[in-house]
Regions:
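An amphipathic, aromatic/His-enriched active-site/gating alpha helix that lines ligand/cofactor pockets
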Residues: 5, 32-46, 63-100
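Short, low-complexity N-terminal intrinsically disordered segments enriched in polar/charged residues
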Residues: 1-7, 28, 39, 113
Length: 113
């Protein structure tokens, strides 16, 4: 299974912690992330799942087309520009820094896409 990872879909879970006063901008960017990546041919048609933690961190679950697509994103000027917008309004944090991650059945507030 691991041998095929370069060409198989890769599910990712990303935690975006908005900078103070940047909650709205962060949410707008998260909502636009997958559509932007889809235009570049880098993600699958899987609908992303978005949710909000108690501390305001936004969690997104989405699927890249492959490891190769992830690598290509790091060289794509449109993706790099989008990521720079993210860095201005939020920090990407490890999932284990989200308070709910220590709970057996972590619950989050759903966010409409």
């Amino acid at each position: 299974m691991k041998d095929d990872r370069a060409t198989k879909g890769v599910i990712v879970i990303v935690a975006y912690r908005p900078k103070p006063g940047k909650e709205k901008e962060t949410l707008e960017l998260v909502r636009g992330r997958v559509p932007t990546l889809r235009k570049e041919g880098l993600v699958t048609d899987r609908v992303p799942t978005m949710m909000c933690a108690r501390d305001g961190t936004i969690i997104e679950v989405s699927e890249w087309k492959s490891e190769e697509a992830i690598d290509a994103a790091h060289k794509n000027p449109n993706v790099l520009a989008m990521w720079n917008q993210f860095f201005e309004v939020c920090d990407c944090i490890p999932l284990n820094k989200v308070p709910e991650s220590s709970e057996m059945f972590a619950g989050f507030e759903p966010i409409a896409s």
